[in-house]
Structures are given as structure tokens and as C-alpha cells.
Amino acid sequence: GGDSLSIVLNRKLDKFLKDHGATVQVREGYGTTECVTASCLTPKDFYKEGSIGIPYPDTYYKIVKVGTTEEVAYNQEGEICLCGPSVMLGYCNNEKETADTLKKHPDGYTWLHTGDLGKMDEDGFIYFSQRIKRMIITSGYNVYPSQVENIIDAHEAVSMSCVIGVKDPYKVQKVKAFVVLKAGF
């Protein structure tokens, strides 16, 4: 599986490319194995920071409350769902996994539940948060490692970071960060 590019790292890459005379830019996208290929890409001339882009033609996205088929409002986080001709028909010889992943919604269409958290804005841009399985639950709160990593990575002394959950007998999990400092710090 993949993960999103942090806003800070994206800025660093774009600056590096520009400083070295490149005329290209980093363009984030999104795709799943179950959807054959990428299904969403950041338009070349319309970038929204933190977005993974807009859906390809004939590919539809919606965000639902986790564990349901209920759509959430714009800019509210939920599970990313996809629908369209490039979505798989099912997993080979695995009816249970197929039933857990492909679900018929009240709109009559079958939607792929990606297992990813994200949101959609009013312009149809998609924002990936992280894998649902990567979420850390500590003292009853949902903590998203990618959000903590973005904050840590924004510090001038930090080269990169990785945040994980570690078991805790009282809090269920505790947040643990691994940090690589820049040279000289």
C-alpha cells in the first residue's frame, strides 16, 4: 500500500525542482489495486494544497461515514468510496472479502470501500488522510499519524518523521514518533 506525500515534503520537492531548472511539478494522485489504476489526479494548472486531485472521467468518488453507506457532508472526513467501470468485480475465490469491500449503496450502485480516510471539498477535490487501519486510538481519541507527522515535519530541524501507535495497558495505544533531524541539529 501507499501513503500520501506530506505537504511539507511536497513543498520541498517542488522547490528543489524549481531551483534546479526543472519545468515539472509533483502531482499527487490516488489509486487502488481494486480499481486497476489511478483514479484521481491533481490537475496541472489547478493545485489545492493537500489534495490528491479530482476523479478521472467515468470514475466517481464519495465519502461515507466509516462502516456505513451514509454519505457525509463536504469537508467532513470519512471512508473514501469509488465507483466506475475500472472497479474490480470481486476478489478471486474470496466472497467474504468481496462482500466487505464492494457494497451496494442506496443510490443503486456498487461502491468500492477503500479502507482509506479522506474528505471531498465543494469543488470535488479529494483529500487523503490515511489508511483506516493506521489510525491510533489513545484514551478514546482518534489520532491520525499523518497529521502528527505533518506537524513534526514542519519544524525547521526535522528532515522526516514517522508516527506509530504502541500498545498501552491504560490508553489502548500511545503515540510514538521517530524523528530524523537535519544535519547540524
Give residue ranges: language-model regions.
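Conserved beta-loop-beta connector loops within the AMP-binding
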Residues: 62-81, 104, 120-123
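Gly/Ser/Thr-rich phosphate-binding loop
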Residues: 1-49, 60
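Active-site glycine/GP-rich loop and adjacent strand/helix microenvironment
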Residues: 39-41, 53, 72-76, 89-93
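Active-site glycine-centered loops adjacent to acidic/histidine catalytic or metal-binding residues
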Residues: 2, 31, 53, 116, ...
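Short Gly/Pro-enriched turn/cap motifs at secondary-structure boundaries
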Residues: 50-55, 108-110
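AMP-binding/adenylate-forming catalytic core of the ANL superfamily
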Residues: 84, 89-90, 100, 117-185
